[in-house]
């Protein structure tokens, strides 16, 4: 390099390290309608000012790095950088802050949850200047959400396919989750569907193990579906889990399900990955299959209050990536879920337009425009005594799924399904007549059990079962 070139290269470039807040903390910034907005719960290391911590998050999740680089001069950082535009303390927590960050739309590939998350929840979560970091919420602008297909079909199309209206749908996860042969598994599916359930489900652990290979399970479950449909006159389904070790194998299983003529398949979207999930969702729309989503592994990501990512973000990501159902907690069962927080992300799954409501953990107003909605699935430790509360909490556009609460019935699988269907129909009728399920729910169940021996037996066996632990996920 000549002396002349060296002199020219040094002009306008000052090497070294400077505070992130000098570039990435911009409290005067006015957010744009096209910006992706994020709310991070930030716990800085001792001695790190909140403005520096928030700016570091904005920098490390967009254009910044630990030192000034000369190639910054080859682009417009003001156009592409993330900006921490507001910081507020978290009430009741020492040294925790909510940092609001705005990202320009051009930072992200269209239609890719994978790329979105690689930036926003990528390496920044291991940044040493932060003791902990949690992504509480995202605002997805219509300019970005319209680049996604979203759910394969959505709530209304599913109801039309099933010809079922005016009530929640009923499901059951086949138990034991592992160890049954394909034929015995299919028998349990048939008995539950014949008894009155709309769906049965593969457990998320069920893929293609030595005791039951996937193709055998698919065939016996399809036989069970058609037999139950013929006997009941209702459309039935079983969530055939297409999750596999490779995308190619996953698609092969989905294709076989379509060839069998079944209405719905299933995917574990977090363990399977967003790229695989989006590919499957596109296939399902093109081929008329509904897509049930299980959230296995979510608690590894969202259970800790100060680090990770809240489930409402994972729920938004799923709506964009694609799924017609997703598990979302029960409020009343054995799994984590505080009522207002749960209903907040349930609305984010189902509704077209959701107003900002910090009391429910919703940090931003979200407009999904025309993207179809997703049915929330309540599953985990629920039984007939929970039916009034579930009907009142989740409303008609939901799936209520009773695994042990069906298969644990003392008289067998079909009577367990009958008990749940009777309880649901009684609760829906009582609600439609103007009765208060929150106050009169137990009485509604007792009245129905007088003419349904199956329900009476279920009420007796589960009358003492409760899961009374305080929720971790609170505001």
Swiss-Prot record:
Its main location: plastid. The modification N6,N6,N6-trimethyllysine is found at residue 14. It comes from the Eukaryota. This is Ribulose bisphosphate carboxylase large chain. RuBisCO catalyzes two reactions: the carboxylation of D-ribulose 1,5-bisphosphate, the primary event in carbon dioxide fixation, as well as the oxidative fragmentation of the pentose substrate in the photorespiration process. Both reactions occur simultaneously and in competition at the same active site. It comes from Picea abies (Norway spruce). It catalyses: 2 (2R)-3-phosphoglycerate + 2 H(+) = D-ribulose 1,5-bisphosphate + CO2 + H2O; D-ribulose 1,5-bisphosphate + O2 = 2-phosphoglycolate + (2R)-3-phosphoglycerate + 2 H(+). GO terms for molecular function: magnesium ion binding; monooxygenase activity; ribulose-bisphosphate carboxylase activity. The record marks 334 as: Transition state stabilizer. Binds 1 Mg(2+) ion per subunit. GO terms for cellular component: chloroplast. The modification N6-carboxylysine is found at residue 201. The basic functional RuBisCO is composed of a large chain homodimer in a 'head-to-tail' conformation. In form I RuBisCO this homodimer is arranged in a barrel-like tetramer with the small subunits forming a tetrameric 'cap' on each end of the 'barrel'. Mg(2+) binds at residues 201, 203-204. Heterohexadecamer of 8 large chains and 8 small chains; disulfide-linked. The disulfide link is formed within the large subunit homodimers. Substrate binds at residues 123, 173, 177, 295, 327, 379. Its EC number is 4.1.1.39. The modification N-acetylproline is found at residue 3. GO terms for biological process: photorespiration; reductive pentose-phosphate cycle. InterPro entries: RuBisCO (IPR033966), RuBisCo_large_chain_AS (IPR020878), RuBisCO_lsu_C (IPR000685), RuBisCO_lsu_C_sf (IPR036376), RuBisCO_lsu_fd_N (IPR017443), RuBisCO_lsu_N_sf (IPR036422), RuBisCO_lsuI (IPR020888).
């Amino acid at each position: 390099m000549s002396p002349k070139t060296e002199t020219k290269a040094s002009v306008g470039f000052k090497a070294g390290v400077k505070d992130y807040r000098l570039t990435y903390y911009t409290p005067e910034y006015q957010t744009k309608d096209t910006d992706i907005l994020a709310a991070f719960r930030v716990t800085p290391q001792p001695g790190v000012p909140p403005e520096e911590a928030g700016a570091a998050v904005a920098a490390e999740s967009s254009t910044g790095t630990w030192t000034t680089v000369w190639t910054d001069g080859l682009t417009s950082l003001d156009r592409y950088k993330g900006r921490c535009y507001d910081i507020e303390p978290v009430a009741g927590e020492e040294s925790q802050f909510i940092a609001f960050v705005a990202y320009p739309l051009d930072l992200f590939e269209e239609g890719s949850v994978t790329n979105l998350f690689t930036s926003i929840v990528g390496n920044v979560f291991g940044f040493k200047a932060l003791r902990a970091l949690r992504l509480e919420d995202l605002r997805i602008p219509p300019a970005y959400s319209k680049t996604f297909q979203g759910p394969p079909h959505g709530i209304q199309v599913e109801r039309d396919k099933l010809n079922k209206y005016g009530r929640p749908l009923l499901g059951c996860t086949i138990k034991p989750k592992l160890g049954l042969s394909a034929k015995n598994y299919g028998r349990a599916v048939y008995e539950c569907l014949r008894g009155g359930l709309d769906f049965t489900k593969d457990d998320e652990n069920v893929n293609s193990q030595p005791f039951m290979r996937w193709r055998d399970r698919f065939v016996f479950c399809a036989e069970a579906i058609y037999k139950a449909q013929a006997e009941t006159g209702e459309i039935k389904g079983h969530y055939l889990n297409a999750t596999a070790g490779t995308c190619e194998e996953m698609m092969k299983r989905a294709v076989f399900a379509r060839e069998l003529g079944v209405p719905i398949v299933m995917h574990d979207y977090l363990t399977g990955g967003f790229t695989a999930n989006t590919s499957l969702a596109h296939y399902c729309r093109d081929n008329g299959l509904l897509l049930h989503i299980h959230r296995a592994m979510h608690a590894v990501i969202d259970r800790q209050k100060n680090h990770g990512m809240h489930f409402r973000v994972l729920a938004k990501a799923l709506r964009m990536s694609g799924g017609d159902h997703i598990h979302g907690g029960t409020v009343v069962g054995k799994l984590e879920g505080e009522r207002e927080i749960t209903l907040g992300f349930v609305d984010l799954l189902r509704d077209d337009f959701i107003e900002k409501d910090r009391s429910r953990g919703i940090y931003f107003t979200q407009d999904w425009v025309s993207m179809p909605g997703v049915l929330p699935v309540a599953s985990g430790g629920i039984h007939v005594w929970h039916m009034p509360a579930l009907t009142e909490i989740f409303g008609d556009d939901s799936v209520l799924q009773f695994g042990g609460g069906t298969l644990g019935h003392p008289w067998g699988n079909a009577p367990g399904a009958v008990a749940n269907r009777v309880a649901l129909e009684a609760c829906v009728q009582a609600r439609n007549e103007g009765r208060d399920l929150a106050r009169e729910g137990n009485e509604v169940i007792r009245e129905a059990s007088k003419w349904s021996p199956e329900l009476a037996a279920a009420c007796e066996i589960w009358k003492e079962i409760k899961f009374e632990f305080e929720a971790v996920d609170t505001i």
